[in-house]
């Protein structure tokens, strides 16, 4: 595998630049963040790749030399779930094997050497499924570790394969959530468990590790707590102190109704569970900053194990409030904000040393790294030391530089070193220079632009097609992002990759209107009660700016598409004169009937957006209802409606209702449904069909289908079309 990986570099360099197709983009290798060993000379990562020939996925683990960038394959064992550096030296690894010979549904912990992986040995057998392992070697030589899994109400680990079944399929609820994202809730919850691997030295001097005792559920003793919290909770929700004595985790406020509140606390607990976890910033903690009641996230221990850095929002019920960086001192039981007035909302934090930190934050359509000293005052304004692309992970190397994993519009994976003093130091690898599927992609295919919106200057992105010629005209593909508190950013986007759209023969425009994130909290906050006001006006002004500025963009044959909030906007556009500016529309998982918001899972979202429940703020719900009779009577632009059955954020009835309405109005329309997908389409085979239908639909009406012989057509999808029309 390793030799083939490096042969691909030559192939990529030698191949001609070709259009990026859905098959190429979806089937290209997908790599994880690179995790360095203790000395910082070797990194570890995994790669997965889907084959449309075999309809299966291959996964392998690799090592990368952090000086030369050269990679070698460590293992392609498909049973391996995760691998981490154990921390005892620079070559010992700890991994989770996803099978257990003795316990169906259980997993095993194995120890291996990176130079002799085949001779790994089993260190522990675990009775249930677990993920997200973190470990440290203590002063005694033993390994303390934590991982996450499901828990029964009594605190024991939940095993899906051994769980009790009932004669009836009935589900009974006395509280909400009933369902969340893509899952109906059960009595099982998520928890962080701790354990120990005891060290011993064999006769030949080799250190061996074996399980010492069982696992301890650190979350369950706190009534109502859950960590990580689904659906997006993960490894960032908990941490193990470097000395192995403490564990910190995040949980939603257990005393508040889950579906109506975003409040969450950071907890601290001894690794052995000898005391019950307590919320360091909960309502009963004297250290809690006054008026700070929103979500907490990303707790991380300092290198000396004495402090915890974390983020918290001020406002409960507002999921897109500004994250502020705080540091909790274990010894002093105090909480200190850092750069409190900084007008950005950082999303991850890393300790460079005991006094200085680095955070990643959205910033002007990218995710950049910023340095923050431990004594930063409220008015400290961090300066970015990375620029283009979007950082997904950062680790401190032994020389205090950072190992960064990122992506961009033009590369799915980039690895480099950087520091606050020097910026980007050395690029080690980039997927567009490794993978034949991505060869020819470059930053020159993308650029940003600024335009005057409803009340402020706004930013957007332009993506150019293959062999772009400014003397020619290309139909506009106008993409509207979801959220609404989100942004089109310089990052690899599997679900809505602008270059895949562009290489059909479009110039793609992606504006960031009111509500977008990364441009200051005022712009984000301004979306409340303003979906069809400033945000809608921003989109019309973005279209007008493009129409007036770029001669090579054909707005007469333009198309528009968007997911979620973007899909709402598409249907709102359909009911307005602006809808006649487009030849075709595509809406993915969008709301249709205002009152149907009562069916959503996270009620805090809609009740914040519209400033009340659907009975308290009925006018606000109706003011953003694209199904109003006067709007429906204007529907006339061909529209593809996409909605999946497991979307519990915006249930599928919204999509069916919209499609029914379009059909009864006689508007050319099609309904695309995935019974096994949620608010996103992530399955590789489903994603291919999604792109075929979306691109086929817009190509049919924009003229691209006639001008580009290689353009995707609706007929490229092999699934049958149900058409019951006489």
Curated annotation (Swiss-Prot):
Q: Which positions does UniProt annotate with glycan attachment?
A: 90, 97, 154, 260, 384, 399, 454, 530, 611
Any idea where this protein resides? Secreted
Keyword Signal set for record: yes
Question: Which Gene3D superfamilies does the record match to this protein?
Answer: alpha/beta hydrolase (3.40.50.1820), TolB, C-terminal domain (2.120.10.30)
Q: Which GO terms describe its molecular function?
A: aminopeptidase activity; serine-type endopeptidase activity
Q: Where's the active site on this chain?
A: 564 (charge relay system), 647 (charge relay system), 679 (charge relay system)
Q: Which GO terms describe its cellular component?
A: extracellular region
- Write down the top EC class of this protein: hydrolase
UniProt keyword annotations, A-Z: Aminopeptidase, Glycoprotein, Hydrolase, Protease, Secreted, Serine protease, Signal
Q: What is its main location?
A: secreted
Q: Identify the stretch annotated as signal peptide in this record.
A: 1-19
In the record, biological process GO terms are: proteolysis
Instruction: Give the EC number(s) listed in the UniProt record.
Output: 3.4.14.-
Return the InterPro entries for the record.
6-blade_b-propeller_TolB-like (IPR011042), AB_hydrolase_fold (IPR029058), Peptidase_S9_cat (IPR001375)
Out of the domains of life, which is the source? Eukaryota
Q: Does the keyword Cell membrane apply?
A: no
Task: State the family named in the UniProt similarity comment for this chain.
Answer: Belongs to the peptidase S9C family.
Q: What does this protein do?
A: Extracellular dipeptidyl-peptidase which removes N-terminal dipeptides sequentially from polypeptides having unsubstituted N-termini.
The identity of this protein, by name, is Probable dipeptidyl-peptidase 5
* Lineage of producing organism: Eukaryota, Fungi, Dikarya, Ascomycota, Pezizomycotina
């Amino acid at each position: 595998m390793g030799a083939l990986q490096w042969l691909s570099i030559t192939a990529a360099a030698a191949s001609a630049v070709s259009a990026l197709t859905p098959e190429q983009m979806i089937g290209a290798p997908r790599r994880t963040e690179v995790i360095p060993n203790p000395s910082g000379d070797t990194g570890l990562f995994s790669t997965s790749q889907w084959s449309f020939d075999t309809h299966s996925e291959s996964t392998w683990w690799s090592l990368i030399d952090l000086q030369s960038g050269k990679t070698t394959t460590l293992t392609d064992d498909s049973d391996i779930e995760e691998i981490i550096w154990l921390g005892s030296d620079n070559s010992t690894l700890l991994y989770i094997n996803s099978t257990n010979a003795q316990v169906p549904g259980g997993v095993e912990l194995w120890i291996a050497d990176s130079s002799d992986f085949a001779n790994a040995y089993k260190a522990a057998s675990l009775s249930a499924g677990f993920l997200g392992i973190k470990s440290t070697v203590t002063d005694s030589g033993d390994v303390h570790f934590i991982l996450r899994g499901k828990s029964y109400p009594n605190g024991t680990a939940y095993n899906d394969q051994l769980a009790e079944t009932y004669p009836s399929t009935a589900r009974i609820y006395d509280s909400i959530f009933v369902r969340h994202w893509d899952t109906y809730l059960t009595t099982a919850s998520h928890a962080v468990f701790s354990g120990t691997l005891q060290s011993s030295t064999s006769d030949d001097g080799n250190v061996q590790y074996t399980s010492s005792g069982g696992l301890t559920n650190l979350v369950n003793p706190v009534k109502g707590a859950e960590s990580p919290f689904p659906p997006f909770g993960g490894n960032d929700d908990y941490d193990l102190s470097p000395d192995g004595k403490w564990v910190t985790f995040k949980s939603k406020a257990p005393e508040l109704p889950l579906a109506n509140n975003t409040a969450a606390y950071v907890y601290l607990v001894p690794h052995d569970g000898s005391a019950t976890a307590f919320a360091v910033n909960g309502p009963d903690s004297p250290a809690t900053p006054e008026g700070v009641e929103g979500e907490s996230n990303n707790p991380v221990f300092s290198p000396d194990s004495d402090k915890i850095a974390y983020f918290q929002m001020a406002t409960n019920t507002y999921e897109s409030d500004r994250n502020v960086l705080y540091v909790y001192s274990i010894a002093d039981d105090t909480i200190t904000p850092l750069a409190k007035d900084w007008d950005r909302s950082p999303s991850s934090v890393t300790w460079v040393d005991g006094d200085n930190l680095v955070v990643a934050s959205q910033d002007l359509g990218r995710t950049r790294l910023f340095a923050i000293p431990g004594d930063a005052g409220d008015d400290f304004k961090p300066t970015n030391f990375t620029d283009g692309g979007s950082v997904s992970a950062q680790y401190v190397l032994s020389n205090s530089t950072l190992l960064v994993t990122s992506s961009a519009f033009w590369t799915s994976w980039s690895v480099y070193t950087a520091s606050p003093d020097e910026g980007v130091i050395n690029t080690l690898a980039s997927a567009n220079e490794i993978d034949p599927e991505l060869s020819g992609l470059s930053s020159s295919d993308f650029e940003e632009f600024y335009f005057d919106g409803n009340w402020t200057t706004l930013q957007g992105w332009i993506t150019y097609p293959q062999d772009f010629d400014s003397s020619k005209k290309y139909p506009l593909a106008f993409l509207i992002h979801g959220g609404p508190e989100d942004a089109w950013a310089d990052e690899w986007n599997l679900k809505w990759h602008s270059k895949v759209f562009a290489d059909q023969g479009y110039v793609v425009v992606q504006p960031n209107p009111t509500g977008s994130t990364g441009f200051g909290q005022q712009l984000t906050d301004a979306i409340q009660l303003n979906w069809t006001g400033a945000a809608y006006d921003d989109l019309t002004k973005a279209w007008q700016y493009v129409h007036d500025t770029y001669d090579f963009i054909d707005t007469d044959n333009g198309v528009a598409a968007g997911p979620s909030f973007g899909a709402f906007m598409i249907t709102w556009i359909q009911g307005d004169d602006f809808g006649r500016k487009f030849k075709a529309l595509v809406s993915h998982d969008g709301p249709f009937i205002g009152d149907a918001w009562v069916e959503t899972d996270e009620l805090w979202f809609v009740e914040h957006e519209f400033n009340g429940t659907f009975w308290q703020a009925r006018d606000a719900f109706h003011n953003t209802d694209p199904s109003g009779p006067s709007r429906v009577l204007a529907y006339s632009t061909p529209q593809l409606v996409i909605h999946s059955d497991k979307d519990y954020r915006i249930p599928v009835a919204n999509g069916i209702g919209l499609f029914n309405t379009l059909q009864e109005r006689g508007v050319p329309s099609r309904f695309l449904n995935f019974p096994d997908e949620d608010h996103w389409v992530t399955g590789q085979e489903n994603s291919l069909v999604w792109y075929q239908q979306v691109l086929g639909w817009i190509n049919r009406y924009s003229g691209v289908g006639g001008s580009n012989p290689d353009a995707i057509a609706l007929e490229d999808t092999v699934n049958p079309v149900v058409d019951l029309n006489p």
